[in-house]
Amino acid sequence: MTKVFCKKYHQELDAIPFQPLPGELGKKIHNEISNKAWQAWLAHQTILINEYRLNLIEPKAKEFLKEEMHKFLFEGKEEKPEQFSEI
């Protein structure tokens, strides 16, 4: 499997096997983010969608997730909603 130096985990890990999003952002993620980090983002995204009851049809919800994705993957910020608790 192809390796990538992951910006989130600061180490060489398995790359995402496909470009996860279209456009330049998708290319950047594919080139700089590991599959491990991408899977962690998908889990975190699910928490955000459920806890904030986001409607993904709404542009504001999509923009919010895009901003949170950038923070999570490239800035190392992983903020869970206040009301969230692990089971």
Curated annotation (Swiss-Prot):
The keyword Iron applies. Belongs to the Fe(2+)-trafficking protein family. It comes from the Bacteria. This is Probable Fe(2+)-trafficking protein. Could be a mediator in iron transactions between iron acquisition and iron-requiring processes, such as synthesis and/or repair of Fe-S clusters in biosynthetic enzymes. InterPro entries: Fe_traffick_prot_YggX, Fe_traffick_prot_YggX_sf. GO terms for molecular function: iron ion binding. Keywords: Iron. It holds the Pfam family Iron_traffic. The lineage of its organism: Bacteria, Pseudomonadati, Pseudomonadota, Gammaproteobacteria, Thiotrichales.
